Amino acid sequence: MSNYAPFIKPYVEYNEHGWGPCEVPELDVPYQPFCKGDRLGKICDWTVSLPEKKFPSKYASTFGNSSQYAYFYEDDDSTFHLVDTTGSKAFKPYQRGRYRPNVRNNVRARGRTGRGNATLGGLGGPVAGGSTANSTKYGKGRNTRNAQNMGRRFGRNAPTRLRESSVMVQSDWVSIEEIDFPRLLKLALPNIKEGKDIATCGSLEYYDKLYDRVNLRNEKPLLKMDRVVHTVTTTDDPVIRRLSKTMGNVFATDEILATIMCCTRSNYSWDVVIEKLGTKVFLDKRDNDQFDLLTVNETSLEPPMDEEGSINSAHSLAMEATLINHNFSQQVLRIGDQEPRFKFEEPNPFEEQGVDLASMGYRYRQWDLGNEVVLIARCKHNGVVQGPNGDMQFLSIKALNEWDSKVTNSVEWRQKLDTQRGAVLASELRNNACKLARWTVEAVLAGSDQLKLGYVSRVNPRDHLRHVILGTQQFKPQEFATQINLNMDNAWGVLRCLIDIVMKQPDGKYLIMKDPNKSMIRLYDIPENAFDSDGDDESESSEPFGNSIDN
């Protein structure tokens, strides 16, 4: 028994009146309130450089912070210094995509492989191993808009392109009215009847139907036609001067009217000069102006840049498109001394002796716009063709041009024109909506029976001097206006609105200008001698395009 330790019974207090010990010694121990829901954290964390900004009180007690357990070092030893030999790492803010892998050349991350070994980009664009044509073919152009904004977060970082104004606004010009496009789109002037011919001048050559058979397998080169085209403004037209003495109170040309009536589709800046003399209003264009140049890809997502010296700059493409349109409209006609011509009642008012004039027929037409507003405008035809019933059908001949489908991210004509002509036309409607609308309005105003469109492309994308005709297509102007969603009632309403504003002004000179960077038009009161210095050489308006354009 001596080998075992003795068992000592512990002292157990017995509480007859409740639970727990009977007596507790007072030790002056303070009580810290706590909550069982508090998170348990570290007492001190020397590895965190900065506290959390989003949840600064993540480990704070529900009952508040108490300083009774805080440690205070009372002895101040100023002679002791702690030297930290490790380099401190500067705090860097969080960067989005910092640890994202490089997917520039990762085909699996960019897209998948389609038929014909064409790689389709997951972000809407072609990658290594695939071509633009195949991507458009199998992707059906679904992500072409997103492909324009690759590398930008929803286009927020897209650079803002500031366009130049067509005319410099002077300090002595007085702003009269500013009308934004949403207001213009609400206007309507219905029930405008067909224009009535009051004078017809010039002569027309017959259309060569062989060009209707032109296709991708039977393309024809575009020839240079050295024939004079007159671009005379309203006040310089001798026929309008004669008619203004006896009839009408608003006078213009079809180009000026089409520009105003289709202003809601324009992006580039343009201007029209207005002269008010009593109850008569003349809509003019400035001398030596680029008003007659055709725009290229004006309404596309990526319009041409203004690069000086480049063949693909906005100005160079406009000159090229104007030259193509002139040459095409004359080449598709049956030209020759032995060929018949359709002659109007009066000769060409701009005829000059010894000058080969282009085939052009002028029709001076009259419209009643209501409220004693009578419009007289000079309209034109480019050719004539004999219909199936033997009747004469007047033509408005225009040309669309392709310069580089890869740059414009559009449909390639040499692959789609014969099989999917609708896709080609839809692409042109998206990129040149304003130009096509103007051509349609001009054809409707002139009363043309057909609007003939030609498809002209460069022989080589890097050569802007040689072109080929790939095909032609014809429409009825009224039906084509419906297809492109052109509301003629709204177009007449826009014109009538501006005429009413000018009619309320005193006699003088005014200017309508499309704002270069905003969707609005502005009306200014300008001095009488505002553009007198621009009209020194009036002969430039009647030069042939072959001499005025460097080709």
Swiss-Prot record:
InterPro entries: eIF3d (IPR007783). Its main location: cytoplasm. Keywords: Cytoplasm, Initiation factor, Protein biosynthesis, RNA-binding. It comes from the Eukaryota. One of its GO terms (cellular component) is eukaryotic translation initiation factor 3 complex. GO terms for molecular function: mRNA cap binding; translation initiation factor activity. Residues 119-128 have a biased composition (Gly residues). It holds the Pfam family eIF-3_zeta. Residues 290-304 are annotated as: RNA gate. One of its GO terms (biological process) is cap-dependent translational initiation. Residues 108-152, 530-551 are annotated as: Disordered. The keyword RNA-binding applies. The keyword Cytoplasm applies. mRNA cap-binding component of the eukaryotic translation initiation factor 3 (eIF-3) complex, which is involved in protein synthesis of a specialized repertoire of mRNAs and, together with other initiation factors, stimulates binding of mRNA and methionyl-tRNAi to the 40S ribosome. The eIF-3 complex specifically targets and initiates translation of a subset of mRNAs involved in cell proliferation. In the eIF-3 complex, eif3d specifically recognizes and binds the 7-methylguanosine cap of a subset of mRNAs. Component of the eukaryotic translation initiation factor 3 (eIF-3) complex. The eIF-3 complex interacts with pix. The RNA gate region regulates mRNA cap recognition to prevent promiscuous mRNA-binding before assembly of eif3d into the full eukaryotic translation initiation factor 3 (eIF-3) complex. HAMAP family: eIF3d (MF_03003). Belongs to the eIF-3 subunit D family. This is Eukaryotic translation initiation factor 3 subunit D-2. It comes from Drosophila yakuba. The lineage of its organism: Eukaryota, Metazoa, Ecdysozoa, Arthropoda, Hexapoda. The gene is eIF3d2.
